């Protein structure tokens, strides 16, 4: 009985991991398709812009020099915005 339960739980865990990996691969392949609108990437860009601006504004309130948030992945913070390097 214990072995059956362990086997069922193991299979369920493998199925969940496999499904998650398959979903990630599908999402990646959709982003890599040529001719697909970059709406997903535009949303990421807008999010970076917002995060950078908000971070800088919060630091200005303390009467200190604004230390801009470090933007990652080929981006840098300039004039309160994340810009592509």
From Swiss-Prot:
GO terms for molecular function: toxin activity. GO terms for cellular component: extracellular region; host cell postsynaptic membrane. Residues 23-48 form a propeptide. It holds the Pfam family Toxin_20. The keyword Secreted applies. It is found in: Secreted. Its main location: secreted. Disulfide bonds join 52-66, 56-77, 71-82. Keywords: Disulfide bond, Neurotoxin, Postsynaptic neurotoxin, Secreted, Signal, Toxin. The keyword Zinc does not apply. InterPro entries: Hwtx-2-like. Expressed by the venom gland. Residues 1-22 form the signal peptide. Neurotoxin active on both insects and mammals. Belongs to the neurotoxin 12 (Hwtx-2) family. 02 (Hwtx-2) subfamily. Monomer. This is U4-theraphotoxin-Hhn1a. It comes from Cyriopagopus hainanus.
């Amino acid at each position: 009985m214990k072995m059956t339960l362990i086997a069922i739980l193991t299979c369920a865990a493998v199925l969940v991991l496999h499904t998650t990996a398959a979903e990630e691969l599908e999402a990646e392949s959709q982003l890599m398709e040529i001719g697909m609108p970059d709406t997903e990437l535009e949303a990421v860009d807008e999010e970076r812009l917002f995060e950078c601006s908000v971070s800088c504004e919060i630091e200005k309130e303390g009467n200190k020099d604004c230390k801009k948030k470090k933007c990652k992945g080929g981006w840098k913070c300039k004039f309160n915005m994340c810009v592509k390097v």
